[in-house]
């Protein structure tokens, strides 16, 4: 099966968001604006409480989904429907903003390490005004597939070729979301089909993809093909993200992602008038 080539490698961009939370943006930057259906990917990894205590106070979303994956630490989520919960170490929350939600994401700790990711996934026009909803799972509910050489694959969304299925369905874009750990010298291979866009987010160690060596905190955007192949130069951890492109216009400003300019303007108007 054809191995996917590398289209582009982009080093993550240090920035801050919310109330001063320090993070590295790996998708959603001038160098990598989006990769249909994925809009943005942030990695946050802070040992100093001052770099995360401000959290993400109340803010709106419409027209897409947010996926929060915690590696270390605890994050409390509250929204304007009265829903509340905590995402703990290894846990996942896949939230559909749909027609609109106002929520906060605040650290449930005042010391220790806070580490994880937030991914934004676009929705097709037919689902942008759907009802908000959640899929939430603790780490014990997320399967880990063991492979030769000590390679492990934590399957959050979708399923591996051998049938290990994550607790979250792929949704409208048939998304795959795998967290792969590779000991030095090992290889990870996975067919993802040639109808998905696929990217890698290297967040620990150093890997080789095709003919390129990739350092930590880099995004690797892959070309057409069937199989994703990663070689570990050192012990490494990598997210594999793949999804079917939506192929529709994207009008995106701040927390709203719509398919028309009129829809984007309406989102701002609805929020300002308290219609969320």
UniProtKB/Swiss-Prot annotation:
**Signal peptide as annotated in the record:** none
User: Which Pfam families does this UniProt record tie to the protein?
Assistant: Pirin, Pirin_C
**What Gene3D superfamilies does the entry give?**
Jelly Rolls (2.60.120.10)
Task: Give the top-rank taxon of the lineage listed in the UniProt record for this protein.
Answer: Bacteria
Matches recorded under CDD domains: cupin_pirin_C, cupin_pirin_N
Query: Family assignment?
Result: Belongs to the pirin family.
Instruction: Identify this protein by name.
Output: Pirin-like protein CC_0481
Recorded source organism is: Caulobacter vibrioides (strain ATCC 19089 / CIP 103742 / CB 15)
